[in-house]
Design a protein with these regions (language model features):
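Conserved phosphate-binding catalytic cores of ATP/NTP-utilizing and phosphoryl-transfer enzymes
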Residues: 14-37
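Conserved catalytic cysteine-centered active-site region
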Residues: 1-16
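Solvent-exposed alpha-helices and their adjacent loops that cap or buttress functional pockets
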Residues: 5-6, 27-31, 41-44
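Ligand-binding pockets and gating/stacking loops
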Residues: 19-24, 140, 148, 152
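A short helix-loop
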Residues: 38, 43-149, 165
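Phosphate/ATP-binding catalytic cores across multiple sugar-kinase/actin-like superfamilies
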Residues: 149-166
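A residue-level signal for conserved active-site and pocket-lining positions in enzyme catalytic cores
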Residues: 22, 82, 159
Length: 166
């Protein structure tokens, strides 16, 4: 990358993935202090994080991580598993699944059986959803639009649990 060694003395700084999301949200907001919730598929190992964010008296943004959930327990990967279930590309076409949700009927209870939580309070899943939905409980949804509506309702209910924790 640097055959002539021009960059060898340039310091390299790394930043935590979820902290970067939190900073982008907080530092572009009009607030001086906030609770910031970050939810994604996987960033380094965190999948959910909750941060206390505020500016100190010198105007520097300060962050304290209050809670986090790690891979494989991931709302984002769960949504990707539903994306794969309807034939879309996981970790790429979730926006299509979200759009499809408006045209389907939610079968929330069936969706919840497919993706059982071991512990609701900590958003801990019984299965690693990185490779898709578990075989047991699959099917019975009907149209792909119904799968999308079920996934959307399930994700929204899980996000409410995370927000209540914050």
């Amino acid at each position: 990358i640097d055959p002539e060694g021009v960059l060898k003395n340039v310091p390299i700084k790394t930043y935590n993935h979820h902290l970067s999301h939190a900073a982008a949200g907080f530092q572009t907001s009009p607030y001086d202090d906030a609770t910031v919730v970050v939810i994604d598929a996987i960033g380094e190992w965190d999948t959910i994080s909750i941060w206390d964010a505020k500016y100190d008296r010198n105007g520097n943004a300060c962050y304290t991580k209050l809670w986090g959930q790690k891979y494989p327990h991931s709302i984002g990967l769960m949504y990707s598993a539903f994306t794969k279930e309807v034939g879309l590309r996981p970790l790429d076409e979730e926006y299509i699944l979200m759009g499809m949700a408006a045209y389907g009927q939610s079968h929330y209870k069936e969706a919840f059986k497919t993706v059982p939580l071991a512990d609701e309070a900590s958003i801990t899943f019984r299965h690693n959803l990185h490779l898709g939905l578990p075989d047991e409980g699959k099917g019975g949804y009907g149209e792909d639009f119904d799968v999308a509506a079920s996934a959307q309702e399930l994700v929204e209910s899980l996000i409410k649990i995370v927000i209540a924790r914050a």
